[in-house]
Amino acid sequence: MALKYQRILLKISGEALGGEKGTGFDEPTMDAICGGVKKAHELGVQIGIVVGGGSFWRGRSSGKMERTLADKIGMLATVMNALAVSDKLEQLGVQTEVFTSITMPQVAPAFTRKDALRAMEEDKIAIFGGGTGNPFFSTDTTTALRAVEVSADIMFKATMVDGVYDKDPHKYPDAKKYDTLTFTKVLEDRLAVMDGTAATLCRDNKLPILVFDLADPDNIARAVQGENVGTLVYEG
């Protein structure tokens, strides 16, 4: 099957790397997720990845800590997860390059659009750590920003739910799943796709988002080939 997308930006939540516990690294889960990424990469698509830091740190659970400091710790957590995903993919025979938004040359080079594009054109998976480098911005916003910067065709948001619903499907059995949505509806109805900053950035730059379930990592390859997976959010 032909590729529907030539270049994607994939967001993986930090909690996903922790398996059922949602913390640290769960080896079988890491194997499965990175195996799914490898399968998609072997189809010929160029891939960039942003990994959240929630398996180690969540700023909203930081108690009385000052917000900017809590967010800085969260940024460092995303760097740890970026390095872990890179290592796992390399073990599977996939070349990667990690870039950070925070200057730490002993760990990884700083992000530039030119270097990220070069890496992907060299058939490497580009992995972005450190968030945007600024507090108050989510890793969803980081993913949207990097996707726009590298001219990705689409942003993939891999979650633990098989798409976007009108209400929480874990709490409400009658929740309705959307196959497609417009950014206008997402923003007006405040649907739980991503934060408003990220959604607005995608809308303004006409960057579609595909939200799908990472419980089956093969969904990444299916989505790249245009199969009906998850919920597609676009500017209608």
Where are these regions (language model features)?
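C-terminal catalytic "cap/lid" subdomain
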Residues: 1-236
